[in-house]
Swiss-Prot record:
This is Fibrinogen alpha chain. GO terms for biological process: adaptive immune response; blood coagulation; innate immune response. Conversion of fibrinogen to fibrin is triggered by thrombin, which cleaves fibrinopeptides A and B from alpha and beta chains, and thus exposes the N-terminal polymerization sites responsible for the formation of the soft clot. The soft clot is converted into the hard clot by factor XIIIA which catalyzes the epsilon-(gamma-glutamyl)lysine cross-linking between gamma chains (stronger) and between alpha chains (weaker) of different monomers. The lineage of its organism: Eukaryota, Metazoa, Chordata, Craniata, Vertebrata. Keywords: Adaptive immunity, Blood coagulation, Coiled coil, Disulfide bond, Hemostasis, Immunity, Innate immunity, Secreted. The keyword Coiled coil applies. It comes from Ovis aries (Sheep). The gene is FGA. It is found in: Secreted.
Amino acid sequence: ADDSDPVGGEFLAEGGGVR
């Protein structure tokens, strides 16, 4: 995942969105 947008759901574990 990325450290940009909290979109995708992975932002809770990765720190960003999976976009």
